Curated annotation (Swiss-Prot):
Belongs to the UPF0270 family. This is UPF0270 protein YheU. It comes from Salmonella typhimurium (strain LT2 / SGSC1412 / ATCC 700720). HAMAP family: UPF0270 (MF_00690). Disulfide bonds: none annotated. InterPro entries: UPF0270 (IPR010648), YehU-like_sf (IPR036685). It holds the Pfam family UPF0270.
Length: 72
């Protein structure tokens, strides 16, 4: 189920994004990016609609994923 990120308190959203970024351990290429930069990138993707915030009832977890990969 998609969670409308706009309805979350700003601190809650930032904490969810930060947790996601730290969990993912994504390789950003030759140049290391700060946590703040990674959080800003994910937030931009949520704002543009490229990514969605998803609640998994099965696992009782929140995740962020590309919108085109989301299936209900």
């Amino acid at each position: 189920m998609i969670i409308p990120w706009q309805g979350l308190a700003p601190d809650t959203l930032d904490n969810l994004i930060e947790s996601f970024v730290l969990r993912e351990g994504t390789d950003y290429g030759e140049h290391e990016r700060s946590l703040e930069q990674k959080v800003a990138d994910v937030k931009r993707q949520l704002q543009s609609g490229e990514a969605v915030l998803v609640w998994s009832e099965l696992h009782e977890t929140v995740n962020i994923m590309p919108k085109k990969q989301f299936r209900e």
